[in-house]
Amino acid sequence: MWIADGWKDYEVIDCSDGEKLERWDKYTLLRPDPQVLWSTPKKNPAWNKLNGHYHRSNKGGGEWEFFSLPKQWTINYRDLTFNLKPFSFKHTGLFPEQAANWDWFSELIKNSPKKDIKVLNLFAYTGGATCAAAKAGATVTHVDASKGMVTWAKENAASSGLADAPIRWIVDDCVKFVEREIRRGNKYDAIIMDPPSSVSYTHLRAHETA
């Protein structure tokens, strides 16, 4: 198991009763987490000093309740800076556990004997992996179907000092983009792929190419 233990601006403070108490820089958020199956005493004072609480609805979805929380703020991981904006389905725009993967492939890129590493990041969301790969020296193609997410990823790149980095921003269906890249004969040294749960395994397998 890899542990994302390089964070200074993020930590899981506590968890109980299906919820996770987190610190995102100087702000404390409480969000639902289905993996928190236990009920333990909530002794940490941070439980009573929330800046944001996402309430899950019995009908699905839910809504945020804010307490002195800005609409947007930044969080740092090593030499990367990300813009956070709480939005639907309890999200903040970043999955901090992915930092373990960022560290892993960043070292591979830096230590590669090949100078120009080309990375394809599919379902790339707000660009955490894109920024990490670009900061390590790779040329990155960032693909996501959401224009809003690609715009957000560009903001993260700019905040991380990567506004002029060799990143190609693509708003497109990832599977269709890959099909076109195969027909074009374009190749990459590495592919990063973290599809949302709404993309079925069968759908992805149907588009596999050796």
Region roles according to the model:
Residues 8-22, 29-96, 103:
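Non-catalytic substrate-recognition/targeting regions of SAM-dependent transferases
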Residues 203-210:
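Single conserved hydrophobic/aromatic residue that forms the stacking wall/gate
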Residues 97-112:
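Conserved alpha-helix/loop element of class I SAM-dependent methyltransferases that forms part
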Residues 139-144:
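Conserved SAM-binding motif I beta-strand of class I
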Residues 126-137:
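Conserved SAM-binding loop of SAM-dependent methyltransferases across substrates and taxa
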Residues 152-187:
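S-adenosyl-L-methionine
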Residues 116-122:
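Conserved class I S-adenosyl-L-methionine
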